[in-house]
From Swiss-Prot:
Entry protein name: tRNA (guanine-N(1)-)-methyltransferase
Annotated Pfam families: tRNA_m1G_MT
GO molecular function ontology, one term from the record: tRNA (guanine(37)-N1)-methyltransferase activity
Gene name for this UniProt entry: trmD
Annotated EC: 2.1.1.228
NCBIfam families, A to Z: PRK00026.1 (NF000648), trmD (TIGR00088)
One record GO biological process: tRNA N1-guanine methylation
Length: 248
């Protein structure tokens, strides 16, 4: 996957290129990330990248000319078919379904705003989609961009050691993940569930599915409203609720 990022702080993206899963993906040639800094497209000696908004009010906007030139440079490097995304609190909220959709694109250009945002005409003429990572205020679009890159890259074939790792992540099937355990078998008197030590793969599968269903019901019940549960899932969830009520 090819990624271009428009940002005033390109050094922040070393967190993507140099570390963890995404860093390995870059090293292995599965992920290609380039940055364009609007400051490199300024024409004054101060490298000005902000400007006052029409109509007054507090704060500044990103200056149109350097930002637009940076976007054009990224588009030229990406070639035809690149999707331009502006990270914005007004955009569609990112969820696993959205991540799956974005992962179908081979080339993405992410525009990271700063200050009070960017000129609306840039959004109208240069941006294909707006995406948000949540209903809260951040200082810029860099952290949302890194969040999007990390989540999307996990679905790029070969990035994870095993595709099952992505398939078993929370939200991959619309449910929260089940609990996980490692050694020791007993920790401060709390034992690993016996079924996980049984070696019975079918029973382990059913237990994990039931725990995912139950955890989703208890912590994010609204997620279940969007799912068409199978007969197996419905039965397992009913058994979970029954057991929970017995121990209430």
């Amino acid at each position: 996957m090819w990624l271009g990022v428009i940002t005033l702080f390109p050094e922040m993206f070393r967190a993507v290129t140099d570390f963890g899963v995404t860093g390995r993906a870059v090293k292995n040639g599965l992920l290609e990330l380039h940055t364009w800094n609007p400051r490199d497209f300024t024409h004054d000696r101060h490298n000005t990248v902000d400007d006052r908004p029409y109509g007054g009010g507090p704060g500044m906007l990103m200056m149109v000319q350097p930002l637009r030139d940076a976007i054009h440079a990224a588009k030229a490097a990406a070639g035809e078919g690149a999707k331009v995304i502006y990270l914005s609190p007004q955009g569609r909220k990112l969820d696993q379904q959205g991540v799956t959709e974005l992962a179908q694109s081979s080339r993405l250009i992410l525009v990271c705003g700063r200050y009070e945002g960017i000129d609306e005409r840039i959004i109208q003429t240069e941006v294909d989609e707006e995406w948000s990572i949540g209903d809260y205020v951040l200082s810029g679009g860099e952290l949302p961009a890194m969040t999007l890159i990390d989540s999307v890259s996990r679905l790029v074939p070969g990035v994870l050691g095993k595709q099952a790792s992505a398939e078993q992540d929370s939200f991959s099937d619309g449910l929260l993940d089940c609990p996980h355990y490692t050694r020791p078998e007993s920790l401060d008197g709390v034992d690993v569930p016996a079924v996980l030590l049984s070696g019975n793969h079918e029973q382990i599968r059913l237990w994990r599915l039931q725990q995912s269903l139950g955890r989703t019901l208890l912590r994010r019940p609204e997620l279940l409203q969007n799912l068409a549960l199978t007969d197996e899932q419905t039965t397992l969830l009913a058994q979970f609720v029954e057991a929970m009520n017995k121990h209430a």
